[in-house]
């Protein structure tokens, strides 16, 4: 996974996608 986001207010749609793809 690129970047370490976890249930955060993602501004970009690709960020949310990556988080969901964990």
Curated annotation (Swiss-Prot):
GO terms for molecular function: serine-type peptidase activity. Coiled coil: none annotated. The keyword Protease applies. Optimum pH is 8.0. Active from pH 5.0 to at least 9.0. Optimum temperature is 55 degrees Celsius. Keywords: Cytoplasm, Hydrolase, Protease, Serine protease. Not inhibited by the metalloproteinase inhibitor EDTA. Detected in muscle (at protein level). One of its GO terms (biological process) is proteolysis. Its EC number is 3.4.21.-. It is found in: Cytoplasm. GO terms for cellular component: cytoplasm. Belongs to the peptidase S1 family. Serine protease that selectively cleaves Arg-|-Xaa bonds. This is Myofibril-bound serine protease. It comes from Cyprinus carpio.
């Amino acid at each position: 996974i690129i970047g370490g986001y976890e249930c955060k207010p993602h501004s970009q749609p690709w960020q949310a996608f990556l988080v969901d793809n964990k």
